Amino acid sequence: MEYSTFGKHIIVDLWGVDFSLLDDMYFLEHHLVHAADLSGAHVLNVSTKEFDPHGVTVLVLLSESHLSIHTYPEKNFAAIDCYTCGTTVEPQIAIDYIVSILKPNEMHIKKLIRGIGEIVNTD
């Protein structure tokens, strides 16, 4: 079987997110896995890490690549990264779901197309 190198990569910075949501590893793990499912991705594994005194990293390893979040609750900030290879998964669905759950006051997003030569910014 031949695979395409084409991929969609979305990176998002969220500001003004509630501290308690960003410091809850189980809440974030549940919602990132659900977001991946909604996007059509296939979850292979989930890795989580709580930091002292605050902060969480959740990495969802996908058959199609990955979805991750790194949080800084004391700054009400989260960094989200979703990269999917091929054309069968829509990472924007995962991002939209996570944003709807976290309800940031401010959001900055970059969308990239990868694997076609030069990285293309779609904004």
Curated annotation (Swiss-Prot):
The lineage of its organism: Bacteria, Bacillati, Bacillota, Bacilli, Bacillales. Its cofactor is pyruvate. PANTHER family: S-ADENOSYLMETHIONINE DECARBOXYLASE PROENZYME. Heterotetramer of two alpha and two beta chains arranged as a dimer of alpha/beta heterodimers. Binds 1 pyruvoyl group covalently per subunit. Pathway: Amine and polyamine biosynthesis; S-adenosylmethioninamine biosynthesis; S-adenosylmethioninamine from S-adenosyl-L-methionine: step 1/1. InterPro entries: AdoMetDC_C, AdoMetDC_fam_prok, AdoMetDC_N, S-AdoMet_deCO2ase_core, S-AdoMet_deCOase_pro-enz. GO terms for molecular function: adenosylmethionine decarboxylase activity. It is an enzyme of class 4 (lyase). The gene is speH2. The record marks E64, S65 as: Cleavage (non-hydrolytic). One of its GO terms (cellular component) is cytosol. This is S-adenosylmethionine decarboxylase proenzyme 2. The modification Pyruvic acid (Ser) is found at S65. Catalyzes the decarboxylation of S-adenosylmethionine to S-adenosylmethioninamine (dcAdoMet), the propylamine donor required for the synthesis of the polyamines spermine and spermidine from the diamine putrescine. Its EC number is 4.1.1.50. GO terms for biological process: spermidine biosynthetic process. NCBIfam families: SAM_DCase_Bsu (TIGR03330). It comes from Bacillus cereus (strain ZK / E33L). It catalyses: S-adenosyl-L-methionine + H(+) = S-adenosyl 3-(methylsulfanyl)propylamine + CO2. Keywords: Autocatalytic cleavage, Decarboxylase, Lyase, Polyamine biosynthesis, Pyruvate, S-adenosyl-L-methionine, Schiff base, Spermidine biosynthesis, Zymogen. Is synthesized initially as an inactive proenzyme. Formation of the active enzyme involves a self-maturation process in which the active site pyruvoyl group is generated from an internal serine residue via an autocatalytic post-translational modification. Two non-identical subunits are generated from the proenzyme in this reaction, and the pyruvate is formed at the N-terminus of the alpha chain, which is derived from the carboxyl end of the proenzyme.
